[in-house]
Amino acid sequence: MAFPKKKLQGLVAATITPMTEDGEINFSVIGQYVDYLVKEQGVKNIFVNGTTGEGLSLSISERRQVAEEWVTKGKDKLDQVIIHVGALSLKESQELAQHAAEIGADGIAVIAPFFLKPWTKDILINFLKEVAAAAPALPFYYYHIPALTGVKIRAEELLDGILDKIPTFQGLKFSDTDLLDFGQCVDQNRQQQFAFLFGVDEQLLSALVMGATGAVGSTYNYLGKKTNQMLEAFERKDFSLALNYQFCIQRFINFVVKLGFGVSQTKAIMTLVSGISMGPPRLPLQKASREFTDSAEAKLKSLDFLSFTDLKDGNLEAGS
């Protein structure tokens, strides 16, 4: 049975795949990206080739190369590198899973196939089981994101008896707003040491109350430090301060969501905040507009998110 070297917990950055202006992967900045996450954001776990990383817009060869680069550059700097290996093809998922094991990744994650969909728990489990078996020494995580996959099988149902079918199962990335489903996942698996990683950044504090052990998200690339401060306040049981941090983070997310927010805009914000060029997204996504970037920068400044200083009381309490 596969056990992680230590339980995956805390913040996990869903990494962006940097690209050049002509749409090729820019491997040259990944080392700098690792250092930025660790030193500036205090984030030492990553989730590679997921939604934020445009994993399903990359070729299998590219996904392998990206995974290798993150593992190599993260050696002795990152705590855990989780590789998303989900694909529409079982064979491709198995190939990516085996490759992740070969390069020394710390775990693999898989979404449900979303074109020819599994409509029952048993069918989905059978698919996941075959992928997990391709990397029997690696911890396996299910990536639950029904809004994108269209697979509406509840995570609570999926987890019931899952270790009997997938002995390497170690947890899930829960990217849905259904806190009833999430809460029941936690409540019904208290005897297990599963990692319950919440994937809706703007609702993280609610998930922590429900028992989340960590979080995977795109905003932890550039708001990791602020979110870590929220986690620290929560651990100290300073719930008022934790709530203020969450509200402040929500102000920014609410602002950009109203402008139109996705992978393209995440790349633009990360470039702005980190100073590392993330480049454009790959088609069919379009590059974020200059108007969006300018508006996002102004909002970040108004919330003091570009200074990397502690939030002031006035900044916490005032709706900017």
From Swiss-Prot:
Aceneuramate binds at residues 51-52, 175, 199, 201-202, 218. Belongs to the DapA family. NanA subfamily. One of its GO terms (cellular component) is cytoplasm. The active site is at residues 143, 173. The gene is NPL. It comes from the Eukaryota. PANTHER family: DIHYDRODIPICOLINATE SYNTHASE, N-ACETYLNEURAMINATE LYASE. One of its GO terms (molecular function) is N-acetylneuraminate lyase activity. It catalyses: aceneuramate = aldehydo-N-acetyl-D-mannosamine + pyruvate. This is N-acetylneuraminate lyase. Its main location: cytoplasm. Keywords: Carbohydrate metabolism, Cytoplasm, Lyase, Schiff base. The lineage of its organism: Eukaryota, Metazoa, Chordata, Craniata, Vertebrata. Pathway: Amino-sugar metabolism; N-acetylneuraminate degradation. The keyword Lyase applies. Its EC number is 4.1.3.3.
